[in-house]
Amino acid sequence: TINNAVCGSTAYCGVDEAQGRLEIGRTFYDRAQWGRVVNPACKFLLLEYAFETWGMYRTAMRADSRNSRSISAITRLGATYEGTLRGFRLAPDGSRCDSMSFSIVHTDWPVVRDGLLTRIDPLRAVSQMDWDTGFDARRNSAAGDLVSDGAPED
């Protein structure tokens, strides 16, 4: 939550501890949060826990090949494109859609971590944020929204 309002969701799925892999997905955010700090901050927390606490070897993310915003957001996280899964799932309208597959492996994590920390700066204390009650990061005085120094954030 931000300012005690739900702003979206992202989650672990397909966790396979024996193989040291998981997927991060089921991500959606309120339009007001698109292009802001929420996605990189949330992904930082999930990736940090996956690699540094859980000891995962690999994390994966997928996006519908028609969803350029999601593809761009995943790419900006530092994930590597691995290929397209053709006809991978049924869309809500009943059509088949292709899913683009991305990953971050443990050897990528230090560079990805540093890139995410740079993007979410000045929120360097992201792992100590109180997501349930909001936090006092730099705010736009008119709207109370989180703002950055102009770095692309999504």
Regions found by a protein language model. Name each.
Residues 1-20, 27:
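A conserved beta-strand-loop-helix scaffold within acyl/acetyltransferase catalytic domains
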Residues 2, 25-37:
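A short, internal acetyl-CoA/4′-phosphopantetheine-binding micro-motif in the GNAT/acyltransferase core
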Residues 15-25, 34, 55-57:
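A conserved beta-turn-beta hairpin within the catalytic core of GNAT-like acetyltransferases
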Residues 35-49, 72:
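Conserved acetyl-CoA-binding loop-helix of GNAT-fold acetyltransferases
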Residues 52-62:
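Conserved GNAT acetyl-CoA-binding A-motif
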Residues 61-71:
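Conserved beta-strand-loop-alpha-helix junction that forms the acyl-donor binding cleft
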Residues 62, 80-95:
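Conserved catalytic-core motifs of GNAT/GCN5-like acyltransferases
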Residues 88-126, 132-134:
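C-terminal "cap" of GNAT-fold acetyltransferases
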